[in-house]
């Protein structure tokens, strides 16, 4: 996990720990059910970011935003597919389905506000979210390996999506999903780092400008 270097990073990490605590409280070691709810929420940030970056491109009438828009929308679609896999495995009950609706609505509102005003912090937070997801799937995989969770057949939809062998198991699916989350972590931390560098360059240019103005005065 990336070490926080400023207040923005600390806030992002604190929010991640807060949401992790809620997930641990509700689901404990029921990782299949945890995945259903969390993957519903995980599909939100990419869609929000992709939409807002798309709108920024339209407003500015400039190119260059395409790769990030596509990356964010691909992330959202990938997380949606994760949800489809674990619905087949966990068979969520009516309470969990209602929880999904409520959690998605709250998080959609929260993250949209965050991304409009604090895009760097938003990407950092999702990077930390994905780091926690990697931990959760690693713990899930360990339970499967030690026999605490039955290593059932992977759902057909997951086998087709990842191109797994026809006899693929839950452990194979978890490894594939975990690899996706690692990629999302790298992408979001990278975007946050780039925005951080851009902010620093702006501050440096402002400082130089102030020095030059003082010399003129």
Feature locations, PLM:
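Non-heme di-metal
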Residues: 1-217
